Amino acid sequence: MPGLLPDIDPDGLLEFSVVYTDRALNHMSKRFTGVVQDILGTLKEVYHAHTAVLVPGSGTFGMEAVARQFANREKVLIVRNGWFSYRWTQIFDADKGLGGGSVVCKARQQGSGPQAPWAPCPAEEVAATIRAEKPKVVFAPHVETASGIILSDDYIRTLTAAAHEVGALFVLDCVASGAMWVDMQATGVDVLISAPQKGWSGSPCCAMVMLSERARQAIEGTTSSSFSCDLKKWMQIAEGYEKGQHAYHTTMPTDALVRLREVMAETREYGFAKVRDEQIELGAKVRALLESRGFPSAAAYGFKAPGVVVSYTTDPGIQNGKKFMEVGLQTAAGVPLQCDEGPDFKTFRIGLFGLEKWHNVDRTVGHLSKALDQIAAAA
């Protein structure tokens, strides 16, 4: 007997499980099995991953799942380029028994003055620190949303080479990467973390954790310190779905994952390389616009992310987003870097994520330009 509602699972079973109602897709259904298979296949294709895992929650749930799987009571090294890579430190500090000590390589201001730009700790210096400290895991942000800093493939390769020399795993946070897809095989990344709501134009509902073959082997010798964020358990569930099998650990966000699968298919049809090119073009034009209006970039030359633009301001109404809201735009307030910045550090942040923005570069730039005109006129 088919499901009651035609938009949920028209070819499925009549819902009487103890998990869902008729208004949500059942995780045991054939339709949802196909959804998960499609998502995992796309993730492995785009990131050149050996294994893909879905962890319900958000990108931060994925970060914590990785930390609690691979870094229990182990020394770690953290590349900190702002508040959202400081999050790794917060995860370890929240459970004093989790970490075995951390070494932090912080971003640095390039030049003097409150609005001098920031660059990550030099790659060779980080690599030397890895070789000297011999951490078990190295964590780095591909794009840091507090500073707008992006790490180049060459920078990442320098760090992964050093990490592998000392037997460490290299973990790259790509939640805020947008369409700047990272090739795990080409860069040597062992664990890559993403999420649906930025680069994938989906609804927030989970973390996507990709593993290299090396990390897939390493996880077998580890035990998570979390029940709900048990990465190995979620990996086993993902591998089961790939075989057409379902299992239960905690309730999965089935309907949001359906939407994610749909937008992934839309992006593939349009072209992953094409949206990457659009992301780069949009970022360059928005950065040029802001700098022409007197808002310097917080990220130094060579490290300017195309998907997250963080700019300096001295205006509290721009910093907290109020003036943008008054003209119809939702921006993000500036946040601290936790990189020894001064008390006068003040920024605002603009996100350039999603198919609607990428496919309509000039329209997106026009929205921002008009808003800046209106803010200036009201000053």
Regions inferred by a protein language model and the residue ranges of each:
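Conserved C-terminal alpha-helix-loop-beta "cap" of PLP-dependent enzymes
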Residues: 291-363
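Generic N-terminal amphipathic, Lys/Arg-enriched alpha-helix
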Residues: 1-28, 306, 349
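Active-site C-terminal subdomain of aminotransferase-like
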Residues: 197-288, 292, 356
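PLP-dependent aminotransferase-like
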Residues: 61, 71-136
